[in-house]
Structure formats: structure tokens, C-alpha cells
Amino acid sequence: MLDFLKRFFGSSQERTLKKFQKLVDKVNLYDEMLAPLSDEELRNKTAELKKRYQDGESLDDMLPEAYAVVKNVCRRLTGTPVEVSGYHQNWDMVPYDVQVLGAIAMHKGFITEMQTGEGKTLTAVMPLYLNALTGKPVHLVTVNDYLAQRDCEWVGSILRWLGLTTGVLISGSPLEKRKDIYRCDVVYGTASEFGFDYLRDNSIATSVDEQVGRGFYFAIIDEVDSILIDEARTPLIISGPGEKHNPVYFELKDKVADLVQLQRELCNQLALEARRGLELFLDMDILPKDKKVIEAISEFCRSLWLVSKGMPLNRVLRRVREHPDLRAMIDKWDTYYHAEQNKEESIEKLSQLYIIVDEHNNDFELTDRGMQQWVDKAGGSAEDFVMMDMGHEYALIDGDDTLSPTEKINRKIAISEEDTRRKARAHGLRQLLRAHLLMERDVDYIVRNDQIVIIDEHTGRPQPGRRFSEGLHQAIEAKEHVTIRKESQTFATVTLQNFFRLYEKLAGMTGTAITESKEFKEIYNLYVLQVPTFKECLRVDHNDEFYMTEREKYHAIVKEIARIHAVGNPILIGTESVEVSEKLSRILRQNRIEHTVLNAKNHAQEAEIIAAAGKLGAVTVATNMAGRGTDIKLDEEAVVVGGLHVIGTSRHQSRRIDRQLRGRCARLGDPGSAKFFLSFEDRLMRLFASPKLNALIRHFRPPEGEAMSDPMFNKLIETAQKRVEARNYTIRKHTLEYDDVMNRQRQTIYAFRNDVIRSEDIFGLAKEAISHVALMIASLIVSRDHPTGNSLPRLEEWMNYSFPLQLNIEELKRLKSIDAIAERVADDLIEVFQNKFASMVQEITEAAGEKVDANGVCKDVIRSVMIMHIDEQWKIHLVDMDLLRSEVGLRTVGQKDPLIEFKHESFLLFESLIRDIRIAIVKHLFRLELTMTREQRPQNVVPVVATSFQNNENFGPLELTVISDSDDE
């Protein structure tokens, strides 16, 4: 029925394209009408359109005319020189109808999927121009600084011709110039720069003048799938150095290395014993039918199954798995031990290992033997694996009648410190093991200049300045014997998911989005529209070639390169990691094939390498870096011989990455071809291929070196990729559910902080905080049942200790109700506060004269105190939330939903945060001290007021130094 309706009415995509095509026709009609106008008259259209918007006309109504203005300008500029990134070129672009259609979709809030070379950059100019007419902030978000700079210089010239201002925001943009950049009508920049400025404005800036942003109205995200999906789980973090080194990594690094080496030796021994037993059978196409022989082979395969749980990448294991029947036996043991009825036997077998490595879920677990080895041989402690039950420990202390109250407090402090030490040690141990077992050099990171540099798993690009969180970076530094740097302290953080949801309107463009359309809709409420190509794509997509082993695969790849290279086609070989790119480069050198390598280690030459990759006979080996944001332009000779030939050395876990690699060839009507080579040892095949595929391998086992190629295999691979994508989507959605809790708290705190920065009535905010604290303390101390009893002296004692306030106990007793008492205390505190600051204003005026705005000085002091304590308490809260997030997963043991528990406890933490902020502010305000310093100044110099905070931990005193230009000594 659904198929019938689609045939009758057309699909949703077809209906949308048809509707937008009507607007395209209107744009072309306006374009013809604008042709007779002079350049000056066309420029004046911008002011006219702005006026019409201010008078109430909607952007949707103005769209056809505004887009026609941009199109007409592009036509008029044809042949004029434009400088882009230091290169001189002539303008030669006028938007095609499909580009206008894509531009309409972006304004309507769609993600437009446009193929490589179809002109996404020019397409974006039209919605940028239209939305900039509002005068509100309009941003174009790119994946790197180079593209931001290029696009601003290149297509930004259209906007500047029309009288709009453009700015570019890159990592080197000085802070003092950023405010001017944000004032531009259209700003180009990277996601991280926009995000970090948002965090700086809300966590570091202490005045309106220091804040650079002006809001979030409309953004177009280039390569939107990379930013909103691949980078979604990577938070933007502003941090500073921690107070001290965590000594755990120094203490444990050698011990952990020894334990991992023991595991390696054990697995190597098991693997070699199995190899000796299976030596005779490795070269047999068909195993013997003898029952006893099969049983013996099966036992050796059982040992190799155990090796797969301790060292998944063991060389002997990989060699044996090349044989389809032996591979099937190992997999059979895996199925056997996963069965519920064999769980005890599985536990007993796995207990032979020191560590169980779960490659599928990227996790590991220490066995009892591993823990014992840690204690006996590695010099560890059994306490490293036992966390303290603080409730039980505190109950024991409280129940010990031999201890005095002071001794009980000291004992609890000691217990708490011991618990903190154990947790830090256990966390450090786990991160060191993770670094050794799950993080691979030249895959997850590279070592450069005594530093660990992260490699982006999706783009293959190095990420200098980024650090793995939660101590993992320090653990890798310890593993690689580079300088272990201090752990950083987080000042502010936000995920890209929640940052981009700040915009009123959001759109995107990419060449690969349709496979993730469900996620875009559910998380960002963005629909994907596939825009038709201007010219038919001439790419030839060959079926994947499957080989049994990695060795056979690389041999076939080299043969393919040699064959194509002989014809002269430029070749781009895509690899999944730095390690693989360097391995393939060695093989090509051995075969004397000239080539260029592009990976995270030489990314600085990217533009130069890509510029040469389309020349006749060029061979380029690249990681995923070459898959996005780069157009490989062919020279004329390369077009004649058939264009760029793309070779994929494996399938990525995401179909989008494969599509990006294919999309490097056959751009804008050029010829080209693409082919992927796979082996059954590839990670995707090993971990996610279906049992059905393994059965087919055994049945169709080809001779050595011969490929298997069939559309059916392609389908099975796509199924495996969909399975991985679904899992990753679930993880991202799960992460967002937790971050949404944090996001609501972040927005509340940032709103409060901005109120403090911008408020003209800062005294009113301070009095509000004082009132809250007084009401809270009175409510906590004074007994609700007997408000006139013994609790009033305790309230008086606390007030005398915390504030210079003498309470009239007799008067409070006459008030009877706790609410009335709390209100009276609040009123008394506010009166003391007002008198204190009135006195300070008078002293400043007497000391500095009328030239100093004494009232303004006091307001600035109050503002500074409030901001300081908001920031300090927020930093502590971020640490508490991280700890809660890491611990809450254990609640599943008690049959509790971790997310519900997280929401509940984070709410309690947030209530505590608000309370602590108010108490800290109020205590500090009442402990301010004024120190007057007079210095001789020239008569014309305006007095300078400097403030410094001392003893912040004790909330004071704050020293206010007034430097006067008075002649008095």
C-alpha cells in the first residue's frame, strides 16, 4: 500500500523538490528583471530588502528576489580577478538551478546532500545573504581554518560587493579583534572557534566589554555530518592546569607494563603450542574427516579462542584464521562459551588469563589471576580493587562510644581521604591498562616532539592541543615514556550537539547525509534533501573484491595499482590509519612505484599533495584526510585516460566514510572509478560480519590469491556497517541524554552569570542572595516545631561567626513563626550590607574626590565577587558531575536505571551548587575590607581603581586599593 501511494503521489523527497522548483523558476524570473539595472542600483537592493524586512515583510517572501540578486552579481563578476589564499584567479561561477534549489532548502532548515564538485560553497552564499538582511548573527561553520579563510575570501566577495560585511574566525584570531569579527553581517569560522567563544563569554569574561559574541540566529554547517555526528561525542572544553601532578601514573606505569607483558607472553605461548599442533593442516584446503584428528584440532582451536580473548591481534591467531574451517572452529567455541548453560565453564577457562580483552565493545576486565598477579608480582595492593563502603564506615565510627566528637570527625576525615586515594589509584590503574590494551600508536594517536597527539578517527587528521579526558592522556604518556603533563581542570564544557541547538535556525550541507537522516531528524529536527546533480555522475563503481587474508589483499592492491599506473590514471588509495598508510607505502617502495603519502604525520603538505593528486600518473596514499573538504582536480591528460581511480583498502565502520572516498573521483561530469579491496581479517569483518557470511566463506573458499566478488557480499558488508552505525547512534543518543541534564544546568548558571555581568541593579542581586542565605540558614537551624526554643542561640552563634550581625533574641522569640524569624534575619542582614557599602562609597569619595564614581566602584566590586564565586563553585560542580557520571553506571547492579539515578542525583548536586554559590558570595561581601592608598599623580590623569582578591578559600578579605590623583600626602 505504501509503495502504491509513493508511486501515485511521489516520495517525500520528490514532493519537496517539486515544491522548491517553483521557487527556482521565480528566482530565474527575477534574475531577468534585474539584468537592466546598473551596478549601483543592484547594490542598493540590499538596503531596500533590509528596509522591507524591518517593515514586516518575511524572508520567505523576499527569497526569490534576494537569491536573484546574488545570482545576478555572480554573472556580472564573471571574468573579474579574485585572490583566494594567495592565488590569483578569475571569477567563473554563476549558480545553476540545482544550486539555487539547494540554497532554498538551506533557508528552509534542510540539510542538503550535494555531490562532490556540485558547488556547495557557492550555494551557501544565497541563504547567508538572505538571512543577513535581518541584522542578526549569521555564521558559516567549516571543518578547518583553511576552508573558513578560503570561503570568506572567495565567495565572501559576493556579499561584500552587495554591501554586507564578512569576517573570518580562525584559531589565530586575537581576542581583542573577535568582537569586531562578530559584528560582521556574516562570519566564517570553525565549529570549535564558535563554541569556545561561547564558553569564554560565559565562563571567563567578567564584563560586557570582554564578551565577543552577539547571539545565535542562523548557521549553515559545511560537512554537517562530520561536525554533528562524527564529532558529536567530543566535548569542547576550556581548561587550565590542575594544581598538581597525579602521582599514580608515575607509580604504576612500570607495574602495569609488567602485567601486560605477562599477558602477552602467556598468549604467545598458547598460540605457539596451538600452531605446532595445527602446522600440518594450515595448507590443506579440506581438513581430514577422522574423528580423533578433528577432536585434536578442535582442542587447539579452543586454545586459540582463549588467545583471542587475551590478545585479539596475535599474529599466530590471525594466520590460523586464514583457514576457513579452522576459523569456523574458533568461532564455534566462541558460540559455545557464550551460551548461558556454559557460563561457568567459560569463566573457568577465561580464568587462565590475566586480563580479558573485549575488542567488540572496546573494553577489558582483570581476572582473579590478574588481580593476584598484580598483588604478588607487580607490587600492587589488594586495596586497589576494593572500594570502601563509606556509609558502613561512618556508622562504625558513630557507634564507637570510646571516641570523642572531635576524634570521630578526625576519623571520618581520614576515612574520606583513604577512600579518595583508593579511587584515584584504581582509576589510574584502569586508565593505564586501557592505554596498553586498547589504544594503538599510529592508529589512535602519534608521538611527536615528546607529546601525544590525538588522531581524529573519522578524518585521520592530527588534533594538536586536544587531550583525552579522565586521565587517559596521562596514561598514554606514561605508556610511551614521554613527559607526563599535569591533569587539566575543566572550567567550562559543552558538546557540539548542545552548542548548535542554541541557534534559532540551523541548516547544513554535505555530500553524505542520507544514511544518517534518522539521527538528524530525531536529535536536531533537521531533514535531509538529496539535491539532483547538475551533470550526470560518470563514476564506475566496481564490486568489492574479497580476499581470505590481509596478505592476499595487499598483494592484489599492488597489482591493481601497477596495472592502472601503467595506463596513466591518477590513483588515490584510501587507508583507515597512519599505520596502514605507512605499511602500504613500504610495499609500494619495494615494488618501485613512485607515490606520495598524506597522513597525520605530514598533514602540513596537504594542499600541495592534493593539488598534485589529479595529475597524469600520480599515486597518492592517504588516510581519511583526503576524503573530505578537498576537490582533486584532474589535468586534461588524466581526463583523457579515464580520470581518477580510487582504491579503498578496507570498508570503514560508517558507510558515509566510504561514500566520501568514492566521491573524490568523477566530480562534476569528470570520468572516474572506485574499487574496494577487503579481507576477512579486516576489523569490520572480524567483529561485525554475520555468521551467514562466515558460512559463505567456508563454502566458496577460493584458491590462494583469488578474489571473491559478488553483489551479495557487498550487501552483507553493508548490513554489518548498518549494525555498527545503529550501535554508534545508540551510544551518541545515550550520551546526549546525559548531557541534556548538564545542559539545562549550564544554561541556568550562564543566565545567572550574565545577569550579574549586565545588571544595572547589582545591589539588588546581592540583596537577593543575602535574603536567600538568611532564609535558608534560619530554616535549617531554627526548629520548626519550637522556633522560640534553644535553636535561636545557635542561630545567633552562626550569624556572629559568619557575619558582623548581632541578633536580638528576645525580639525574635516574640515573632513565633520560623518564616517571620527568617524574614527578620534577612532584613537585618540587608540593612547591615547597605550600611557597609554606603560607608565604603563615602570613604572612596573622600579619598579620591568627585572624579571617581565611588558608587560605580562598589558595584564593580560586588560584581567581581559574585562572578568569582559563580566560576569557582561551577568548576567544583563540573568535577562532581564527572564523578557522578562515571559511577552511576554501577547502579545497574541494583536493578536501577542509571539515567534516572543520574537525573535525580545531579538535581541534588545542582541545588547544593546554588546554595554554595550564594553562601560564598554573601560571606565574601560581608568580609570586604577597604584599604586606602594615595599616590601622587599628574592632575589630568583619571584615578585608577584596582581590586585584588586574597584568601579566596576563606572568602576574604578583598582588598580594594584606590589610587588618587590628589596632592595630599
Swiss-Prot record:
It catalyses: ATP + H2O + cellular proteinSide 1 = ADP + phosphate + cellular proteinSide 2. Keywords: ATP-binding, Cell inner membrane, Cell membrane, Cytoplasm, Membrane, Nucleotide-binding, Protein transport, Translocase, Translocation, Transport. GO terms for molecular function: ATP binding; protein-exporting ATPase activity. Its EC number is 7.4.2.8. ATP binds at Q99, G117, E118, G119, K120, T121, D631. GO terms for biological process: intracellular protein transmembrane transport; protein import; protein targeting; protein transport by the Sec complex. Its main location: membrane. It is found in: Cell inner membrane; Cytoplasm. This is Protein translocase subunit SecA. The keyword Membrane applies. SMART domains: SecA_DEAD, SecA_PP_bind. InterPro entries: Helicase_ATP-bd, Helicase_C-like, P-loop_NTPase, SecA, SecA_CS, SecA_DEAD, SecA_motor_DEAD, SecA_preprotein_X-link_dom. Part of the Sec protein translocase complex. Interacts with the SecYEG preprotein conducting channel. Has a central role in coupling the hydrolysis of ATP to the transfer of proteins into and across the cell membrane, serving as an ATP-driven molecular motor driving the stepwise translocation of polypeptide chains across the membrane. NCBIfam families: secA. The gene is secA. The keyword Protein transport applies. Monomer and homodimer. Part of the essential Sec protein translocation apparatus which comprises SecA, SecYEG and auxiliary proteins SecDF. Other proteins may also be involved. Signal peptide: none annotated. One of its GO terms (cellular component) is plasma membrane. Belongs to the SecA family. Pfam families: P-loop_SecA (PF21090), SecA_DEAD (PF07517), SecA_PP_bind (PF01043), SecA_SW (PF07516). It is a peripheral membrane protein. It is an enzyme of class 7 (translocase).
